[in-house]
Amino acid sequence: TFSVFMYRRALDQIEMSIAYPNLPVKVFGFLPGITTPGGASHQAINDIAVMRSLPNFIVFETGDATDVESVIPLANSVPGPVYIRMVRGALPRLFPASDKIKLDKARILTQGEDLVILSSGICTEEAMRAVEILNNRNISVNHFHVTTLKPFTDPEILYAIKNTKFGVITMENHTKIGGLGTCVAELIAEHCLNKKLKKIALNDTYLHGASKRYLMKKYSIDANALIAKVEELIGRKLYILNKDLASARIDTYFNEKQQEAL
């Protein structure tokens, strides 16, 4: 069902009838964040924060066709309850079908020492566009596509943050409170890492209803927003234009005109 109807209306049943007895129930929430035009009544902007707080639950988020195809067998392999934040409709295939989603293991999309960028869900496509241009400007990026929000203990992420030059940026289709940015902030604090963190996420507010593209721009969770945060971290302007981002070829598996209906 819609993510909002699942975690808002049935939270007591989920907590007492699934989480508390630690039952192997797999809960799917569709159309998260700004992926639905239905406005505040239909937009799940804080579902990760809520579901991460439930004992025993594992939390996944999908971002492309490969994630969607491979998350079900992965969820079934987990003995306890699982929440899957699921995109649907026309989806890009950003990763080859053989590159399946893994528990508590982010995909490493690019490697570099200047910045660490962690993106999730629909924001990864936007981040990939920006990272392509950044690499062309000699800014090296360690870019992770995060699909497990709980647990959040991937040692590759911790190592990258420890060794980055300028800092860390998170990018997500969720409120700034309790989502991917919070996961990373907790990781930095727990390991006493002296690293700057910039969050790209939805502000602590309810949203308008409109198209996904319009809302990503309006609420600053698109490629332009990522470039602006990079400029803040490195302390200089990059003069990257909209046409530069639009022309970025992000992956050989992506074809905007042949998105897959899943």
Q: Predicted regions: what is each one?
A:
Residues 1-116, 125, 141, 246-254, ...:
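Conserved thiamine diphosphate
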